[in-house]
From Swiss-Prot:
This is Claudin-12. It comes from the Eukaryota. Residues 1-10, 109-135, 196-244 are cytoplasmic. Residues 32-87, 157-174 are extracellular. The keyword Zinc does not apply.
């Protein structure tokens, strides 16, 4: 499959981007970012674990699947700085990644359905597929950075909480889901960069990141209406003379 066709690398990056955005969405909604485990020494009582998410909080006894306390207004009263930052960082990261997916889709559709004979009237509306993929790679990298940094901060903030209070705090599996999704965004960006750097060595302006006419556009002459403003001297008009 040539670089001028819909390449397997671009399809793989698109699917990887979708999976990464889905992982970020799941990590954003999961109520399993931090656990607060309260241990009792009374044999007649059970240990209590408080699961803290970005939007809700749930407290349940050990061995129970039902929440003893389910706080749906937790998102407005979050008192932990790392979770408050994640409330803004993860939706922003998903928004950037979805913009990158849209650019990837535009680039692939333009590559798959473009005509081999360009329409001169639509010359200013042509889409540069390589440029779309290049910008999408940059956006994927930005989205991964926005989501990865605060997710790793949760790990170090747990250490701070355990030192400040008691060693009862631990991070939960939503941290792993988000870090893995951010890694998927970085891998998507890397695939697009490798694809672009491999294909741009072709001697064609098609691989320039900015808009440029395809090579076949230069073989077309301008319509006569664009030349009609030339003077009679510039236009080669045959002159017929009559001899007596």
């Amino acid at each position: 499959m040539g670089c001028r066709d819909v390449h397997a690398a671009t399809v793989l990056s698109f699917l990887c981007g979708i999976a990464s955005v889905a992982g970020l969405f799941a990590g954003t909604l999961l109520p399993n970012w931090r656990k607060l485990r309260l241990i009792t020494f009374n044999r007649n009582e059970k240990n209590l674990t408080v699961y803290t998410g970005l939007w809700v909080k749930c407290a349940r006894y050990d061995g129970s699947s039902d929440c003893l306390m389910y706080d749906t207004t937790w998102y407005s009263s979050v008192d932990q700085l790392d979770l408050r930052v994640l409330q803004f960082a993860l939706p922003l990261s998903m928004l950037i990644a979805m913009g990158a997916l849209l650019l990837c889709l535009i680039g692939m559709c333009n590559t798959a359905f473009r005509s081999s004979v360009p329409n001169i009237k639509l010359a200013k509306c042509l889409v540069n597929s390589a440029g779309c993929h290049l910008v999408a790679g940059l956006l994927f990298f930005l989205a991964g950075t926005v989501s990865l940094s605060p997710s790793i901060w949760v790990i170090f903030y747990n250490i701070h909480l355990n030192k400040k209070f008691e060693p009862v705090f631990s991070f939960d599996y939503a941290v792993y889901v988000t870090i893995a999704s951010a890694g998927g965004l970085f891998m998507t960006s890397l695939i697009l960069f490798i694809w672009y750097c491999t294909c741009k060595s072709l001697p064609s302006p098609f691989w320039q990141p900015l808009y440029s006419h395809p090579p076949s556009m230069h073989t077309y002459s301008q319509p006569y209406s664009a030349r009609s403003r030339l003077s009679a001297i510039e236009i080669d008009i045959p002159v017929v003379s009559h001899t007596t």
